[in-house]
C-alpha cells in the first residue's frame, strides 16, 4: 500500500509539472503574437522552428529514454552502467550532429529559409543538442524516484522563460524574434547546470553488446515517435 501511494504521488507530481508547464507556455503566445512584427515572419517563425526542433529531438534521442527504463529496471545490467551507456550514445550522436550542422550552418539555414538570420538556427541547434542530452538525466531522475527535482527543473525552465520574455517583449517593448530563441538557449543552459550532479554520475564504459541490445529495443520507439510528431505538427 505504501509503495502504491508513493507511486501515485510521484505520478501526480510528474503530471502536474507537465500540465502547469503547458498552461504557462500559453501565456507566451499572445506576447509573441502582439510583439513580433509581421515583416519578420511574426510568431510563425517561432512555431516553424519549434516544429523542426521537436522532430529532430525525437530522432536524436532515438527512443533511448524508454530503452534506459527497460534495461535499468530489467535487472540484468547495472543501472548506472545502463545510464552511462545511454548518455554516451545520445550525447555522442547529439554533439556530432551539432558540430556538423554548425560547420554547414549557412547553407543549411539558407535551405530552411533562415538565410538572413543563420544565428536563429544556430542557437536552436545548440538548444536541440542540450535538450537531447538532458533527456537521459531526466529519465535517470525518474528511475531514482526523484520527482521533486524532475518537476522543479522543468518548471524552472518555464518560469525563467516567461520572466525573460515578459522583460524583453513587454517591459522593454522588444520585437526581435531572435531574442526568443536566445531566451530558450539561456533556459536550457540553466537546466543543464541543475543536472550537473546527474552528469557527474556518468562513467565512460562503452559496452557494444549492451548498446546493440538497447538500440534494437529502442528503434521501434523512434519510428513511433517520429510518426507521432509528424501527425502532431502536420
Task: Please report, for each region that a protein language model flagged, where it lies by residue.
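Residue-level recognition of transmembrane alpha-helices
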Residues: 14, 18, 47-50, 90, ...
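Membrane-interface helix-loop junctions in multi-pass transport and translocation proteins
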Residues: 31-43, 144-149, 158-191
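Short membrane-interface helical motifs at transmembrane helix boundaries
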Residues: 96-114
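Interhelical loop/hinge segments that connect adjacent transmembrane helices in multipass membrane
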Residues: 1-7, 148, 152, 177-182, ...
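Hydrophobic transmembrane alpha-helices of multi-pass small-molecule transporters
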Residues: 22, 26, 55-58, 98, ...
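Alpha-helical transmembrane segments of multi-pass membrane proteins
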Residues: 55, 91, 99, 113-134, ...
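Signature of the first transmembrane helix
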Residues: 6-65, 94, 98-102, 162, ...
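Transmembrane-helix boundary and interhelical linker motifs in polytopic inner-membrane proteins
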Residues: 2-5, 33-43, 56-90, 140-149
